[in-house]
Amino acid sequence: MSTCGMCAGSSYCPHHQRASWPAHDHRSPPPVEYHDFFHHSVQGQAAAWLRLDNPPLPQPAEHDQAAAGMIHGGHRHGTFELNRPLMDDQHLLQMPPPPTIMPFGGGTFGDTMGREAIMAVDGEMMMVAAHHPTMHEREAKVMRYREKKKRRRYEKQIRYESRKAYAEMRPRVKGRFAKVPGSAAPPSPPPSGPRIYIASCFKSNGTVIVQEVMHDLPI
């Protein structure tokens, strides 16, 4: 087993591990004590991977170039773009593009929607016309109603005509019906005397028969 020539350690000594890494910087930076494990490190290359958590800051030249690009807008005209926010706002305030009209059933989608709207309006107009008939239809309905009313009143007219003829035959006094005189009155029936009713009942073959006899008494 080989030993380290500096610390007399085994092959797993930090010096052997350091030797396996390539050395890119031959300058000797000041010793930095990151941990007790690296107290033998002189050049500090073994702990270089610990400094990778914080990336290096940009160089002044790159920073100046980036600032110049932001100031000049990448055109190198030497002027500031003061109206750039206004242009961005105008871009945001632009109207959206109109919807794309796609073909649909032999025509455009807009034409199809227009036809459907027209058909709906026509249907509503037909329904309104059905509820509100025209003048000719109204006249025809009125004539049918009058004819039906005449036929319904035909019997009443006959009855009224007969009553009218009978009223014309009756005598009138100053437009009013006059009483019929006694000579024209029909003769009254003769007066009759008292009557007596005699009832007799008898039984025949188990049936009771009641016989009633009326006799007029002399006055």
Curated annotation (Swiss-Prot):
GO biological process: positive regulation of vernalization response; regulation of flower development; vernalization response
Main location: nucleus
Induction: Accumulates in leaves but not in shoot apical meristem (SAM) meristem during vernalization in cv. Bd29-1, but expression is independent of vernalization in cv. Bd21.
InterPro entries noted in UniProt: CCT_domain, CONSTANS-like
Gene Ontology cellular component terms for the protein in this record: nucleus
PANTHER family: TRANSCRIPTION FACTOR GHD7 (PTHR31319:SF98), ZINC FINGER PROTEIN CONSTANS-LIKE 4 (PTHR31319)
Tissue/organ expression: Mainly expressed in leaves, and at low levels in the shoot apical meristem (SAM).
Function statement: Involved in the regulation of vernalization; this process in essential for flowering in cv. Bd29-1 but seems do not occur in cv. Bd21.
This protein's record includes keyword Nucleus: yes
Protein name: Protein VERNALIZATION 2
Location of the protein in the cell: Nucleus
Gene that produces this protein: VRN2
Domain of life: Eukaryota
Domain CCT: start-end pairs: 138-180
Keyword annotations: Nucleus
Organism: Brachypodium distachyon
